[in-house]
Amino acid sequence: MQLEDFMRYPDLVCQAAQLPRYTWNGRRSLEVKRNLAKRIIFWLGAVNLVYHNIGCVMYGYFGDGRTKDPIAYLAELASVASMLGFTIVGTLNLWKMLSLKTHFENLLNEFEELFQLIKHRAYRIHHYQEKYTRHIRNTFIFHTSAVVYYNSLPILLMIREHFSNSQQLGYRIQSNTWYPWQVQGSIPGFFAAVACQIFSCQTNMCVNMFIQFLINFFGIQLEIHFDGLARQLETIDARNPHAKDQLKYLIVYHTKLLNLADRVNRSFNFTFLISLSVSMISNCFLAFSMTMFDFGTSLKHLLGLLLFITYNFSMCRSGTHLILTSGKVLPAAFYNNWYEGDLVYRRMLLILMMRATKPYMWKTYKLAPVSITTYMATLKFSYQMFTCVRSLK
């Protein structure tokens, strides 16, 4: 098994939106140069994603609520605000993916070096690889299904209106966005807006999935190493003449893992903060919009709500598993037969135990930990906001 095997799905989402693929020393498959057509697809998606932010703001600015029911108008604004949350997260993730490409590739180089050292040892690589692949495969299938439904909904609604002998077509695009051309009442303008949002949605979903998978990738690699470190600590025989050398190696190994985990944390600090804070507000708006529209549109908002929930759950799940796995180091050191070692061995083991007193956890700028506890707190806050807004009806 190679480190590259863990990057199957991240590479797949890069290919879907023609995003630049990450490379590092030791990767077997070489980087495929994108031709002109692929670069055009990428830039169409990126430009439309950036414009989508502007279009949502302009739609809210130009919207006239005087001719509508106040509650319906509020639901429409909530729908626009929730979509703006999606595009903000996607745009920032795209910026991070491109601007920190070299930094992430350097991290991948270091994880590759560590992986080459352990792949022939008794590490549970296959166990963690299966767990990781199963999780992101299910996430990939759900996101793909959501994208297909989201982008096909305008066409399906127009076909239904056409065959139901409706006197006037709705011309409803994927999300309420302002465009500098006529959309309502214009077939070419309608399909142009739908095409723009298809490119925007494709890039948005692929970038968000890539960042989500990359966080899970780094998390599962750290889990493999912390688990292997704990298992090696348990098997050290303090009576062995080479025990001090083995323990010294593990102390250096543990220090390197903590440094790598800190670098990963610093790389995703902004992502953690934006994702958790934006999702709290967007979940409230999506839940409110879901209760105000027809079945097809409500299902679209339900999928959006589930996308935000699974996006944050995936990050917090990875952080929680890292906490649990890194927490194995201290018990492994304690239950080692240290009492049969000499004084130098005991002092060295004490150094490692002091560093492993608390399990390692990712944090958002040293504030809230990235864990299921924080995830549940964000859901609770979103629900409180939803009940408050819903009571206004």
Curated annotation (Swiss-Prot):
Kindly list the biological process annotations in GO that this record carries: detection of chemical stimulus involved in sensory perception of smell; signal transduction
Topology of this chain in the membrane: Multi-pass membrane protein
Q: Which compartment or compartments is the protein found in? A: Cell membrane
- Assigned keywords, A-Z: Cell membrane, Membrane, Olfaction, Receptor, Sensory transduction, Transducer, Transmembrane, Transmembrane helix
- The superkingdom of the source organism is Eukaryota
Which residues are on the Cytoplasmic side of the membrane? 1-39, 91-138, 230-269, 327-365
Q: In which tissues is it expressed?
A: Expressed in olfactory sensory neurons in the antenna.
Keyword Iron-sulfur among record annotations: no
User: So which stretches are on the Extracellular side?
Assistant: 61-69, 160-208, 291-305, 387-393
Q: Which residues cross the membrane?
A: 40-60, 70-90, 139-159, 209-229, 270-290, 306-326, 366-386
Q: Name one GO molecular function term.
A: olfactory receptor activity
Q: Does the keyword Cell membrane apply?
A: yes
A GO cellular-component term linked to this record: plasma membrane
Please give the family membership noted in the entry. Belongs to the insect chemoreceptor superfamily. Heteromeric odorant receptor channel (TC 1.A.69) family. Or49a subfamily.
Subunit field text: Interacts with Orco. Complexes exist early in the endomembrane system in olfactory sensory neurons (OSNs), coupling these complexes to the conserved ciliary trafficking pathway.
Give the miscellaneous note. The atypical heteromeric and topological design of the odorant receptors appears to be an insect-specific solution for odor recognition, making the OR/Orco complex an attractive target for the development of highly selective insect repellents to disrupt olfactory-mediated host-seeking behaviors of insect disease vectors. Odor-evoked OR currents are independent of known G-protein-coupled second messenger pathways.
Role: Odorant receptor which mediates acceptance or avoidance behavior, depending on its substrates. The odorant receptor repertoire encodes a large collection of odor stimuli that vary widely in identity, intensity, and duration. May form a complex with Orco to form odorant-sensing units, providing sensitive and prolonged odorant signaling and calcium permeability.
Output this protein's name.
Putative odorant receptor 69a, isoform B
